[in-house]
């Protein structure tokens, strides 16, 4: 819907996930799987100015209209890599998992930029921590042998309200 009223969008990469009919616009929309066939393992570095825009992320608008916050390349990347290494004490071989929403600055910083700049193994999760039951986070920790787990206190409190029986079946010994 949004792209119908935004003619400035030149390309849209579409990933098929649900097997539902997808309305594609010729010349603009391309399939992810087709584009991936064109990719090589060689990815030359693009030299950027330190103050070049890296991305714009919009605020929630909780105090009014959402505002686009532009983050610069060097400052943001240096900060997220440094804070990731020092706050989470990541070591090579660790499996790190931040449960934040990737559309928020915490998700951007500690799912994508910080871990990848540090060469870390980072996990992404799509869904809610209570589906199919309140043991979902702990199931993922066990299955993937997560060492470092970062989530919000509100998430833990909401799961805690469901009781500790959802935690007990899982082996959490991989956590530091």
Question: What are these regions, as identified by a protein language model?
Answer:
Residues 9-15, 19-20, 24-58, 65, ...:
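Conserved pre-ATP/AMP-binding loop-to-beta segment of ANL
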């Amino acid at each position: 819907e949004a792209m119908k009223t935004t003619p400035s969008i030149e390309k849209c990469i579409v990933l098929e996930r649900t097997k539902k009919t997808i309305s594609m616009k010729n010349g603009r929309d391309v399939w992810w799987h087709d584009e991936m066939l064109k990719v090589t393992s060689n990815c030359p570095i693009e030299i950027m100015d330190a103050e070049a825009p890296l991305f714009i992320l919009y605020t929630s608008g909780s105090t009014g209209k959402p505002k686009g916050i532009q983050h610069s390349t060097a400052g943001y990347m240096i900060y997220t890599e440094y804070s990731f290494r020092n706050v989470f004490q990541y070591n090579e071989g660790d499996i790190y998992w931040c449960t934040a929403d990737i559309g928020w600055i915490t998700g951007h910083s500690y799912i994508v930029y910080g871990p990848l700049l540090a060469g870390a193994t980072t996990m992404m999760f799509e869904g809610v921590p209570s589906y199919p039951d309140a043991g979902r986070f702990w199931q993922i920790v066990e299955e993937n042998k997560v060492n470092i787990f970062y989530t919000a206190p509100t998430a833990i409190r909401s799961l805690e309200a469901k009781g500790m029986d959802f935690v007990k079946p899982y082996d959490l010994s991989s956590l530091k």
